[in-house]
């Protein structure tokens, strides 16, 4: 025990040099939950998608208070489980101090404890299709698959508790007030789809499942109390339309705007979005950032606020948007196989709070614990 005490003291000194603040709480054990590495008390996680079929998906950790990460590369899943996460990290959510991750290429969903140590795993065979995105509601994890299902898993042990049939290429899923909203895109072999499925978690059956036609090749759904913001790749994969579904009236509407990624904004009527447009002759990308208010059907351009704080975000390859705490949000950029991505953290007033490496290729999702 004396050795451990000395080791922790030394570790606190090291944490200062890496800007971690966890050691400020004498009661906090940076090795809690059986961790093999010292972890900051208030931490964030970055899911790096990696490169397809390269088995290099990873989860990196960072100090969510200071927006700092380690000086040397960190791969939390590898450190804790002594094996690679797998091929193509798809989605990551946190619920009740547990981490749930879907790995598309490796065809499984795993439950990790707060330290990132695997507790349970659900493999997906050809009958269900490969897993895509995740949502949680009332003790269950809901998984979309490329077999055309939303699969219901018990959050404790990932045992299967049911499934409903949706479109063949089910993509993002979001939950609001016990209702699941599911985007269904076009299939890899070109079969078109433009439906958003609506599923009541209290009546999780094929018969009760509904759908509504929205934009072509639907990809993203972002649900609030009042609206669902919907993004698609469009019929030709070039212009990426932004639609809004009014939950009360049950009517979808094309906003006339384009978006590449979208997340919930500062209230239940607003979404924050980015539209990335690339000129394939010059390979120059121009990013436009905006807030869309569904209640007033108005767009507010905030590009200058974002790019004045982080000039790289004017032309970088944007890979994801993620919601943070207290109205903050994360923007990630990718260099694909050329190097690590970068994470940018902004507050609700578009002030840059910090930026740091993702320690992996193509950061797909950021969450805070």
Predicted feature descriptions by range:
Residues 54-138:
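Post-signal peptide N-terminal segment of secreted/secretory-pathway proteins
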Residues 159-163, 168-282:
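Acidic, serine/threonine- and glycine-rich low-complexity intrinsically disordered segments
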Residues 43-47, 98-102, 140-143, 179-183, ...:
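Conserved beta-propeller blade signature
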Residues 24, 28, 68-84, 116-125, ...:
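A short beta-strand motif characteristic of beta-propeller blades
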Residues 342-344, 348-369:
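Blade-level signature of beta-propeller repeat domains, shared across WD40, Kelch, NHL, RCC1
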Residues 32-34, 86-93, 128-138, 168-177, ...:
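Repeated scaffold domains used in trafficking and secretory/extracellular systems
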Residues 1-6, 10-45:
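Bacterial Sec-dependent N-terminal signal peptides
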Residues 50-54, 106-108, 148-149, 186-191, ...:
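Short glycine/acidic-enriched loop and turn motifs that connect beta-strands
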């Amino acid at each position: 025990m004396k050795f451990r005490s000395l080791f922790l003291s030394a570790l606190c000194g090291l944490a200062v040099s890496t800007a971690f603040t966890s050691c400020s709480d004498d009661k906090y054990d940076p090795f809690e939950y059986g961790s093999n590495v010292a972890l900051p008390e208030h931490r964030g996680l970055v899911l790096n998608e990696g490169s397809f079929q390269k088995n290099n998906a990873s989860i990196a950790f960072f100090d969510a208070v200071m927006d700092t990460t380690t000086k040397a590369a960190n791969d939390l899943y590898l450190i804790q489980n002594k094996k690679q996460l797998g091929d193509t990290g798809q989605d990551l959510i946190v619920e009740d101090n547990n981490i749930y991750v879907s790995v598309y290429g490796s065809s499984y969903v795993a439950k990790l404890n707060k330290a990132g140590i695997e507790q349970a795993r659900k493999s997906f065979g050809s009958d269900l299709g490969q897993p895509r995105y995740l949502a949680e509601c009332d003790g269950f994890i809901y998984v979309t698959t490329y077999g055309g299902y939303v699969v219901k898993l018990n959050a404790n042990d990932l045992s299967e508790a049911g499934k409903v049939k949706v479109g063949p290429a089910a993509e993002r899923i979001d939950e609001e007030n016990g209702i699941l909203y599911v985007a269904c895109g076009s299939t890899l072999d070109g079969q078109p789809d433009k439906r958003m499925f609506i599923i009541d978690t209290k009546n999780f059956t094929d018969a009760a499942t509904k759908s509504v036609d929205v934009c072509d090749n639907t990809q993203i759904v972002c649900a609030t109390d009042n609206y669902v913001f919907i993004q698609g790749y469009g019929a030709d994969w070039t212009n990426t339309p932004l639609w809004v579904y009014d939950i009360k009236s049950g009517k979808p509407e094309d906003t006339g705007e384009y978006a590449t990624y979208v997340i919930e904004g500062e209230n239940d009527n607003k979404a924050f979005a980015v539209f990335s447009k690339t000129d394939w002759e010059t390979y120059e990308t121009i990013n436009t950032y905006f807030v869309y208010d569904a209640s007033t059907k108005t767009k507010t351009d905030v590009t200058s606020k974002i790019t004045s704080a982080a000039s790289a975000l004017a032309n970088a390859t944007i890979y994801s948007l993620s919601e943070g705490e207290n109205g903050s949000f994360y923007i990630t950029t990718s260099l694909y196989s050329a190097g690590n991505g970068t994470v940018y953290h902004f507050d609700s007033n578009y002030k840059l709070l910090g930026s740091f490496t993702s320690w992996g290729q193509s950061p797909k999702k950021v969450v805070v614990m």
